[in-house]
UniProtKB/Swiss-Prot annotation:
Keywords: Acetylation, Membrane, Transmembrane, Transmembrane helix
Species this protein is from: Arabidopsis thaliana (Mouse-ear cress)
Pfam families with a match to the protein in the record: Rer1
PANTHER family for the chain: PROTEIN RER1 (PTHR10743), PROTEIN RER1A (PTHR10743:SF17)
Function: Involved in the retrieval of endoplasmic reticulum membrane proteins from the early Golgi compartment.
InterPro entries: Rer1
UniProt similarity note: Belongs to the RER1 family.
Transmembrane segments: 39-57, 60-80, 115-135, 136-156
GO biological process, one term: retrograde vesicle-mediated transport, Golgi to endoplasmic reticulum
Keyword Membrane attributed: yes
Subcellular location(s) per record: Membrane
Origin superkingdom: Eukaryota
GO cellular component, one term: membrane
Protein name: Protein RER1A
Amino acid sequence: MDESGGDSGSVATPVQQRAHEAWRIYQHYLDKTTPHANYRWIGTLVVALIYCLRVYYIQGFYIIAYGLGIYLLNLLIGFLSPLVDPEAGGVSDGPSLPTRGSDEFKPFIRRLPEFKFWYSMTKAFCIAFLMTFFSVFDVPVFWPILLCYWIVLFVLTMRRQIAHMIKYKYIPFSFGKQKYGGRSSSGSRAD
């Protein structure tokens, strides 16, 4: 007889229950960081600095650093790109950017939101840091060639992205709500 008294397929093992509970706690703390963008980015900079110091002091794992750089460049392009690309044509699932002066204003919606950009970047630095503890990933390469190639790739990619921004007249950065300098009232308002 079945002692569980129900469907045995729905009963989770203690390991699965612990894993689910750990995931819920992790997600809770991750959700609590959402409104604190400055602190999140400071934490990511600290993680990036620790990773850079590790690579510098052990004098290796340059191929991991190169792969990380390519991945971060890909994330940056996603962060700077609009959700709906005006070059893609007429098919549009959501709001698009205005291309003519007569078009109505449509807000800039990123292809990769800031939180996902931060989370992916931080996760990438952590994974790259962990990879530096395994010698199998320490492929001997001449790092100046990788650095030069990455710089050329970065310059060409950003030139294309900036040309796209100029062509379609969008700016992917906003610094909060726009404030207008209205005239100051010299007297008090009568209610």
